[in-house]
């Protein structure tokens, strides 16, 4: 696992097409912004596991 330190407003780039920006830090929560092509699905981990297990519907899906 790669571990990075970023401050609010700073960005990391993944594979020249995905940008992850730290938008805010409040207590133990971090707000991230993700820019990616439409064909790349983006989910919170817990939602992803539900989708992979066949639980939930489109209303629960979180896409950018």
UniProtKB/Swiss-Prot annotation:
HAMAP family associated with the record: CsrA
Coiled-coil stretches: none
PANTHER family xref list: CARBON STORAGE REGULATOR
InterPro entries for the chain: CsrA, CsrA_sf
Subcellular location: Cytoplasm
UniProt keyword annotation of Repeat present: no
Pfam families in alphabetical order: CsrA
Keywords tagged on the record: Activator, Cytoplasm, Repressor, RNA-binding, Translation regulation
SUPFAM superfamilies per UniProt: CsrA-like
Any single GO BP term: mRNA catabolic process
Gene Ontology MF terms: mRNA 5'-UTR binding
Entry protein name: Translational regulator CsrA
Family: Belongs to the CsrA/RsmA family.
Lineage of origin: Bacteria, Pseudomonadati, Pseudomonadota, Gammaproteobacteria, Cardiobacteriales
GO cellular component terms, A-Z: cytosol
Known partners and oligomeric status: Homodimer; the beta-strands of each monomer intercalate to form a hydrophobic core, while the alpha-helices form wings that extend away from the core.
Major site of localization recorded for this protein: cytoplasm
Role: A key translational regulator that binds mRNA to regulate translation initiation and/or mRNA stability. Mediates global changes in gene expression, shifting from rapid growth to stress survival by linking envelope stress, the stringent response and the catabolite repression systems. Usually binds in the 5'-UTR; binding at or near the Shine-Dalgarno sequence prevents ribosome-binding, repressing translation, binding elsewhere in the 5'-UTR can activate translation and/or stabilize the mRNA. Its function is antagonized by small RNA(s).
């Amino acid at each position: 696992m790669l571990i990075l330190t970023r401050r609010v407003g700073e960005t990391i780039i993944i594979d020249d097409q995905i940008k992850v920006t730290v938008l805010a830090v409040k207590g133990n929560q971090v707000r991230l912004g993700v820019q990616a092509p439409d064909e790349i699905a983006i989910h919170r981990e817990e939602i992803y596991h539900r989708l992979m297990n066949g639980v939930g519907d489109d209303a629960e899906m979180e896409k950018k």
